[in-house]
């Protein structure tokens, strides 16, 4: 998944950008995931609010905006800035950790370790490449490319190549490009592909080389340029569209391909389409109706709360039907 979130270009873009920056600080520096989730949820709700917010009190009427966040919104609206953020930006350690986590392959713990060793910038990383693992070296190599959002038009071209090449390998493959792209976003951080085949189910005693065959085909046509990691069921790598006739080169992009058992495929498609908040709301509704949902299965809960056997699922619609929830098209799941 991409580390770069799209900058907010809504009526309340200043507020949502502030909240996203606070969220990233809590995740990368403080490692307070509950605060990260709270800021993310508030930013998501405010991004869809159709009016310009004039006060913290107005924002507080929205679900997910509590007293503390409302107070920060008041301060931001009154002064155009936030003391807490100013302090974070001025703190060399915090800002360096936050920056280094933007490099693919560098998480908060690795970033803190690098900063403790005096490695704080891209230049520092380049001078200390011997301390980087393979994933981090690729992240550093393509840092500028990975920072760029992928326009939808480019994502559509990438999707065409991936789906066409997969069908060349075997017409029985089923593949879906998920993430914010499937929800209709104008730009994406990376490409997230889910793959399945009738020959692979959760009952399969061994995993056939279904994923490797697809990756090899995409390498053969020079779409996949680098491999970050490759297992039996998940590939993480780098891809690039072919150059234009005028010689213009497209940026390198992150791509993940996951192979999922056929009987678990649509639970996976639902989960990886998102959004995070939509998934949480759907799981909560499922529990109220006596079901538990995750990225693999939907299962009924018995009277003791123990989950039963997975239910058969042949489409996303089936999952909505089981929990008696109105079907939502992917474009309507960005809450």
Swiss-Prot record:
Q: Give me the residues that bind Mg(2+) 1, please.
A: 190, 192
Instruction: State where it is primarily located.
Output: nucleus
Post-translation changes: Methylation by PRMT6 stimulates the polymerase activity by enhancing DNA binding and processivity. Ubiquitinated at Lys-41, Lys-61 and Lys-81: monoubiquitinated by HUWE1/ARF-BP1. Monoubiquitinated protein is then the target of STUB1/CHIP, which catalyzes polyubiquitination from monoubiquitin, leading to degradation by the proteasome. USP47 mediates the deubiquitination of monoubiquitinated protein, preventing polyubiquitination by STUB1/CHIP and its subsequent degradation.
Please tell me where K(+) 2 binds in this chain.
101, 103, 106
Ligand binding (K(+) 1): 60, 62, 65
Spans annotated as DNA-binding: 183-192
Protein task: Repair polymerase that plays a key role in base-excision repair. During this process, the damaged base is excised by specific DNA glycosylases, the DNA backbone is nicked at the abasic site by an apurinic/apyrimidic (AP) endonuclease, and POLB removes 5'-deoxyribose-phosphate from the preincised AP site acting as a 5'-deoxyribose-phosphate lyase (5'-dRP lyase); through its DNA polymerase activity, it adds one nucleotide to the 3' end of the arising single-nucleotide gap.
This chain belongs to the protein called DNA polymerase beta
Protein source organism = Mus musculus (Mouse)
Q: Gene name? A: Polb
């Amino acid at each position: 998944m991409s580390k770069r979130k799209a900058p907010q270009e809504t009526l309340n873009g200043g507020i949502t950008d502030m909240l996203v920056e606070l969220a990233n600080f809590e995740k990368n520096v403080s490692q307070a995931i509950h605060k990260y989730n709270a800021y993310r949820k508030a930013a998501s709700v405010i991004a869809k609010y159709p009016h310009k917010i004039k006060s913290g009190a107005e924002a507080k009427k929205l679900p997910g905006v509590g007293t503390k966040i409302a107070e920060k919104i008041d301060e931001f609206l009154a002064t155009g800035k936030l003391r807490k953020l100013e302090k974070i930006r001025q703190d060399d350690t915090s800002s360096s950790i936050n920056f280094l986590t933007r490099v693919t392959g560098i998480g908060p713990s690795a970033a803190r370790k690098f900063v403790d060793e005096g490695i704080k910038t891209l230049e520092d990383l380049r001078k200390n490449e011997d301390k980087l693992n393979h994933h981090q070296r690729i992240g550093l190599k393509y840092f500028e490319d990975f920072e760029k959002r992928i326009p939808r038009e480019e994502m559509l071209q990438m999707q065409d190549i991936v789906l066409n090449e997969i069908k060349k390998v075997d017409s029985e493959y089923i593949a879906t490009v998920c993430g914010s792209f499937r929800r209709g976003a104008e730009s994406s951080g990376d490409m997230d592909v889910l793959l399945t085949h009738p020959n692979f189910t959760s009952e399969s005693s061994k995993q056939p080389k279904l994923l490797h065959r697809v990756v090899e085909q995409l390498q053969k046509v020079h779409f996949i340029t680098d491999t970050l990691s490759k297992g039996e069921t998940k590939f993480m790598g780098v891809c690039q569209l072919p150059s234009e006739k005028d010689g213009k080169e497209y940026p390198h992009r992150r791509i993940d391909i996951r192979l999922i058992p056929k009987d678990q495929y649509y639970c996976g498609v639902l989960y990886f389409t998102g959004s995070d908040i939509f998934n949480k709301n759907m799981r909560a509704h499922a529990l109220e109706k006596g079901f538990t949902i995750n990225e693999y299965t939907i299962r009924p809960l018995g009277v003791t709360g123990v989950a039963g056997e997975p239910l058969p699922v042949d489409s996303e619609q089936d999952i909505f039907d089981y929990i008696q929830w109105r079907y939502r098209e992917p474009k309507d799941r960005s809450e």
